[in-house]
Curated annotation (Swiss-Prot):
Disulfide bonds: none annotated. It comes from Methylobacillus flagellatus (strain ATCC 51484 / DSM 6875 / VKM B-1610 / KT). It catalyses: octanoyl-[ACP] + L-lysyl-[protein] = N(6)-octanoyl-L-lysyl-[protein] + holo-[ACP] + H(+). Keywords: Acyltransferase, Cytoplasm, Transferase. NCBIfam families: lipB (TIGR00214), PRK14342.1 (NF010922). The active site is at 173 (acyl-thioester intermediate). This is Octanoyltransferase. It comes from the Bacteria. GO terms for biological process: protein modification process. Pfam families: LplA-B_cat.
Length: 218
């Protein structure tokens, strides 16, 4: 029975642009309803402009602009921005069933993005003091997770081809003056759609899945 559960296909949901609040609530509901037979899932999406404030709120500078909504959420970390042209992948895994630590999951997420950039000649790295992926000190991807009963939700956001100006109104991830960058500005000619598929392939491999199914709805 344990072998059967470990080899259930990974479900990849390609959702297009979604409402942040509705997607967050769907993640919570799925995680709450999970049992030992539930599939692990990756949700690929993109959001309309929104700031999200994680659970680590001490000393956070709130956005200096008010034309973009701000929502308080239950992931780790501080404040970040989501918007069109950014690849978002939510990671809904049963870590206990997979024998995976949170640190291993974070590393898999970071390593998949680092490998994607390396394919295009860009050297990127993670930082122990600030989860995410960086290119020459500028942040190109953010991470944030929540665990309930060793089941994860939330995930990663990789900047592809977006308006970076909203990041100027915050201290990304709580770091004053932290620069941000994106795939387009590094001279990589990848659409969000192409980058998303490449990243899904790499993340699936990093997580150790060999069988996956794709669906387009929640």
């Amino acid at each position: 029975m344990q072998h059967e559960r470990m080899n259930r296909p990974l479900i990849i949901r390609t959702l297009g642009r979604t409402d942040y609040l509705a997607t967050w609530q769907a993640m919570q509901a799925y995680t709450q309803s999970r049992d030992e037979h539930s599939h692990d899932e990756l949700w690929l999406t993109e959001h309309a402009p929104i700031y999200t404030l994680g659970l680590n709120r001490k000393g956070v500078r709130l956005p200096s602009r008010h034309d973009i909504p701000l929502i308080e959420v239950d992931r780790g970390g501080k404040i970040t921005y989501h918007g069109p042209g950014q690849v978002v992948i939510y990671v809904l895994l049963d870590l206990k069933r997979r024998g995976m630590s949170v640190r291993s999951l974070v590393s898999a997420m970071e390593d998949s993005m680092i490998a994607l950039l390396a394919e295009h000649g860009v050297t990127a790295a993670a930082r122990a003091d600030a989860p995410g992926v960086y290119v020459e000190g500028a942040k190109i991807a953010s991470l944030g997770l929540r665990l309930k009963h060793q089941r994860s939700y939330h995930g990663l956001a990789l900047n592809i081809d977006m308006d970076l100006a909203p990041f100027l109104a915050i201290d990304p991830c709580g770091y004053q003056g932290l620069q941000v960058t994106q795939v387009r500005d590094l001279g990589i000619a990848l659409t969000s759609e192409a980058a998303a598929q490449k990243l899904l392939d790499k993340l699936t491999t990093q997580l150790g899945y060999t069988d996956r199914l794709t669906e387009n709805t929640l």
